[in-house]
Amino acid sequence: MTKSELIEKLATRQSQLSAKEVEGAIKEMLEQMATTLESGDRIEIRGFGSFSLHYRAPRTGRNPKTGSSVDLEGKYVPHFKPGKELRERVDAVNV
């Protein structure tokens, strides 16, 4: 599901809100989440999961074109850990 599809689905389910209002709310929510992670804080949404930063240590990688070694710096990357309720719902899916 894309952000546009999410906006459309929520606007349909929440008939008292326009698509523009839903879009604004989703954009603001995502911006606040990004700002929170950017400041190094953790986000927890009970039943859904938590977002945090994990540190990737410096390492030696490879340039796929040339095969030569490349030194990669350490960095922080976003990490999502699903909550128990979400894990159980996904586990129940028969694909």
From Swiss-Prot:
Which keywords does this chain's UniProt record carry? DNA recombination, DNA-binding, Transcription, Transcription regulation, Translation regulation
Assembly behavior: Heterodimer of an alpha and a beta chain.
Q: List the GO terms this entry assigns under cellular component, sorted alphabetically.
A: chromosome; cytosol
- NCBIfam families of this UniProt entry? hip (TIGR00988), PRK00199.1 (NF001222)
InterPro entries reported for this sequence: Hist_DNA-bd (IPR000119), Histone-like_DNA-bd_CS (IPR020816), IHF-like_DNA-bd_dom_sf (IPR010992), IHF_beta (IPR005685)
Please report which protein family the annotation says this sequence is part of. Answer: Belongs to the bacterial histone-like protein family.
Function of the molecule: This protein is one of the two subunits of integration host factor, a specific DNA-binding protein that functions in genetic recombination as well as in transcriptional and translational control.
Query: Which terms does the UniProt entry file under GO BP?
Result: DNA recombination; regulation of DNA-templated transcription; regulation of translation
Upper classification of the source organism reads:
Bacteria, Pseudomonadati, Pseudomonadota, Gammaproteobacteria, Alteromonadales
Q: Name one GO molecular function term.
A: structural constituent of chromatin
Query: CDD domains, alphabetically?
Result: IHF_B
Which parts of the sequence are annotated with region: Disordered? 56-76
- Protein name per its UniProtKB record: Integration host factor subunit beta
